[in-house]
């Protein structure tokens, strides 16, 4: 079951962010078998650049939204074959982000912090991991420092404190690391997304 939560989305950054802002506050209504629908993806449409397209897709995956492509998929093909250099195709086929979107727990992301143009949103996953997204809503590059133990303070996320640190999987670069904090420099209108797992 799904229900539209907003008017039709438009292929511009203002509309993407406005739609996100409404839906991130509706997290408690999403769950297994029922989803908020913030409308189709505008990835690859209009004047959205690659960072904005990646952020748009990241946010919809974090919101457990239905992923319905709104672009012309013929642009994904070159000489009758998938164009492996097509940046939009790379974005919408990111298997790590799709796995977050389609996680069987079905819970949507909750905004856990908002500071200096950075939204920090997180959602619990069925295996006990947490998907964590750092979203730069500002029109300039921002730096952020986030203590991962802060995730354990919100019962909604259900993650255990891990004194020895956390395993981090960057879902866009596919890089893996361990640590207790995230220090990131994020370009304007961009996201960084991690899958976080206690090392205990």
For every predicted segment, state its role.
Residues 140-144, 163-164, 177:
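Short acidic/proline- and small/hydrophobic-mixed sequence motifs that coincide with surface turns
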